[in-house]
Regions:
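Short, structured beta/alpha segment
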Residues: 1-96
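Conserved C-terminal structural/oligomerization subdomain of aldehyde/semialdehyde dehydrogenase
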Residues: 35-41, 233, 270, 324, ...
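Short, well-ordered beta-strand elements within core beta-sheets of diverse protein domains
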Residues: 38-45, 60-66, 158-159, 269-272, ...
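N-terminal Rossmann NAD(P)-binding subdomain characteristic of aldehyde/semialdehyde dehydrogenases
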Residues: 65, 70, 74-170, 213
Length: 494
């Protein structure tokens, strides 16, 4: 039994400060992608459980909002300390639940520790503005008024997390919500419930009062829908697919609720003819094959100038073939499994479609058989046409499709020929050309001479178009999770 999984292998729901079984008595298996074997069982919450969690959060809304900011900061720092002390157990839990190589899983824990510490710091920066009242003619009497704004907690926040970063991306929702004075209902992915449940243990031990943090595990329909539509919930923060994000936005919109959506992407990496080849290949290996490509900011379309495309393809294929594919808990593994067998089948379909459209396979292109796990070889495709499915659908796997271009205008057109717009990257020695391209590419972030998958936890992160709404990044998420209130004071005759 992996440490961190409850005795008996069954998880529980966390509602109102107590652990309880799902009211319907149902559980679903949690499968290790590296082996295909069950790690334990996730509780399957009911609509009644979801409503109870939202009710519990609502009952404690005012209580948590009244906790002084310095006390909330102390609790968040305590949670960070507990996570840091539990680093190895958390990392092994992540690796086992979602197949992330253990070396990467440790980095995820470290990033999450930093998120809680940053959230504690940002509490001091969450302020309002003052205004020169006498600068406004109307209403009359402004020379005797003082005007300022404050930020109030928005209310109950629903945090819906993905499988690929079951600790860090969930923390990017939970930490700013708590820091801003909001209670939270967490719905982690059913593929990785134990990471979220252990996080709840650490937050509770650090001092989060009962009912302020609640965790329910279950399918989006009906459990997620019940949370989104509950009268007490005021904001939904979601990371996942665009189709599910749209569904959440539609349902939240019916009740005028705010959403933060981090959704899909087809992030382009543009390689100009003067780019340093070794640096670009190294960045592509990290940006495309890291965590088996199951990253929303992975480099999913490699737009390479035709003059260097042959050399780039050969070098990337050589690196791809050298990557060690293996179980997540193996310290030597560089590329682990994808999340499940259905993902392997989808990758096979995308590669077969590309082959049928005259793309060539330079490396990989097939599944890898290792102890019953769901593995797919790091794959490099060349001469990929623009109508291939692999560059129209987010693959979420270790596939590097190369699209060749001859003119910069063509590169921009191809980069923008997608409904998404999360991240992008441009490699060139000419920074003026790079900056010009950065302005023309439609994305929430553009990196020059760095891979697409960079993220700074304290800085704004998010997409445009169908990649998302709103921004994460501690300060920016806290702004989304608060309401601006204007206060006026008339001191005439006081």
């Amino acid at each position: 039994m992996i440490e961190g999984i409850p005795p008996g292998g069954r998880g529980a729901l966390f509602i109102g400060g107590t652990w309880r079984p799902p009211s319907g008595g149902r559980y679903s298996p949690v499968v290790d992608p590296s082996t295909g074997l069950a790690l334990g069982e996730a509780p399957v919450a009911t609509v009644e459980d979801a409503r109870a969690a939202a009710d519990s959060a609502a009952e404690n809304e005012e209580r948590w909002a009244r906790v002084p900011g310095h006390e909330r900061a102390r609790i968040l720092r305590g949670a960070a300390d507990r996570l840091a002390a539990d680093r190895e157990t958390m990392a092994r839990l992540i690796a086992s639940e979602v197949g992330k190589p253990i070396t990467d899983a440790r980095v995820e824990v470290d990033r999450a520790v930093g998120v809680y510490r940053l959230a504690a710091e940002e509490i001091r920066q969450l302020g309002g503005e003052s205004f020169p009242a006498d600068a406004y003619e109307r209403p009359a009497g402004n020379e005797n008024r003082f005007l300022f704004t404050v930020r109030d907690p928005i209310g109950v926040v629903v945090a819906i997390g993905p499988f690929n970063f079951p600790l860090n991306l969930l923390s990017h929702k939970v930490a700013p919500a708590l820091a801003a004075g909001n209670p939270v209902v967490v719905k982690p992915t059913s593929a990785a419930p134990f990471t979220a449940l252990r996080l709840a243990e650490h937050l509770t031990a650090a001092g989060i009062p009962p009912g302020v943090l609640n965790v329910v595990v279950g399918p989006g329909d009906p459990v997620g829908d019940a949370l989104v539509e509950h009268p007490a919930t005021r904001l939904v923060s979601f990371t996942g697919s665009t189709s599910v994000g749209k569904r959440i936005a539609e349902r939240a919109g019916r009740h005028a609720k705010r959403v933060i959506l981090e959704m899909g992407g087809l992030d382009p990496l543009v390689v100009l003819e003067d780019a340093p080849l070794d640096a670009v290949v190294g960045a592509t290996v990290r940006g495309t094959f890291g965590y088996s490509g199951q990253v929303c900011t992975a480099s999913k379309r490699l737009l390479v100038h035709e003059s260097i495309a042959d050399a780039f393809g050969r070098a990337l294929a050589e690196r791809a073939r050298s990557l060690r594919v293996g179980p997540a808990l193996d310290e030597q593994t560089e590329v682990g499994p994808v999340i499940d067998g259905a993902s392997v089948e989808r990758l096979e379909r995308l590669v077969e479609d590309a082959r049928g459209r005259s793309a060539s396979v330079l490396a990989g292109g097939s599944r890898v058989s290792i102890r019953g796990g769901s593995f797919y070889a790091p794959t490099v495709l060349d001469h990929v046409p623009e109508d291939a499915l692999v560059v129209r659908e987010e693959p979420f796997g270790p596939i590097a499709p190369i699209l060749r271009f001859s003119a910069v205008d063509d590169a921009v057109r191809i980069a923008n020929a997608t409904p998404y717009g999360l991240q992008a990257a441009v490699y060139t020695k000419d920074l003026s050309r790079g900056l010009a391209l950065a302005k023309r590419i439609h994305a929430g972030g553009v990196h020059l001479n760095d891979p697409t998958n960079l993220r700074w936890d304290a800085l704004p992160f998010g997409g445009i178009r169908e990649s998302g709404l709103g921004r994460e990044g501690l300060r920016y998420a806290m702004q989304e999770m608060t309401e601006v209130k204007l206060i006026s004071i008339n001191y005439a005759g006081s």
